[in-house]
Structures are given as C-alpha cells and as structure tokens.
C-alpha cells in the first residue's frame, strides 16, 4: 500500500474515532439529563473501545512513519493526526466522567441541571465535527470558523 492510501485509511479511522467520541458526548449529557443509568453504562463501556482505537491509530501513524519516511508536509500532517488522536481519546474520557455523574443525579432527584448543559453538548459536538472535517479535508477556512 502506498503513502496516500495509508493516509486515507488513517483519515477514515480518525473519522470513526471522532464519530464514536461525538456519540459518547451526546449520550453522556443525555444520560445525566434524563438520569438514565443504562445509557451512562453504555457510555462508560464504550470508553474502552475509544481507548483501543486511539492505540491502534497511534500504531498506524508510527508504522507509516517507519515505512515511508514522509516528506515535510506529510510528516506535519501525521504529527497533527497523532495530536488529534490523543485529544479525541481525552475528550472520550471526559464523556465517561460526565456519564459517571448520572448515579449522583439519580440519588439527588431534587437537583436540576442548567439548561446551558444541553446546549453545551450540542456546541461541543458541532465544534468537534467541524474541526475533524477541516483537518481531514485540509480546509483552512473551515478550521478558522
């Protein structure tokens, strides 16, 4: 497989990871808001898949670096992909931590979540989606928006 094909595969895997993280963010906020323990367990269990995907993507980038010795532009792209990969995993951890608060909300039914919380989930996932797409498509204007 040549370098452009490997980078295309890497992009696909980053999109899959990003999509999984976005879903977990939405589900985590929803679980807390609705006090849904089952949904919170799903988010928590999905975190291990996110962690495994992060490790696989890191291995993939390292393999590309060893195999192809990429040019400056490709090297910068691959290093950025590593950073994004790490940040996606970290965001996934935050989603898990949010989901873990569901039990607290169930135990304290008198507590109400601020309306801004639901809006925060929408804003966060929208920003994440735009950032990943800008990176994958190498679209500077989208990244600046």
Task: Briefly describe each language-model feature range.
Residues 1-145:
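Cytosolic, long alpha-helical scaffolding segments
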């Amino acid at each position: 497989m040549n370098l452009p094909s490997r980078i295309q595969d890497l992009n696909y895997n980053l999109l899959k990871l990003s999509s999984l993280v976005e879903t977990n963010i939405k589900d985590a906020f929803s679980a807390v808001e609705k006090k849904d323990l089952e949904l919170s367990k799903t988010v928590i269990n999905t975190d291990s898949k996110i962690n495994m995907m992060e490790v696989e993507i890191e291995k993939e980038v390292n393999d590309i670096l060893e195999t192809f010795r990429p040019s400056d532009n490709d090297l910068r792209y691959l290093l950025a992909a590593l950073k994004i990969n790490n940040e996606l995993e970290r965001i996934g951890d935050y989603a898990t931590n949010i989901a873990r608060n569901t039990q607290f909300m169930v135990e304290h039914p008198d507590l109400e979540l601020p309306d801004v919380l639901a809006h925060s989930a929408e804003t966060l996932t929208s920003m994440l989606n735009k950032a990943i797409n800008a990176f994958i498509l190498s679209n500077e204007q989208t990244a600046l928006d």
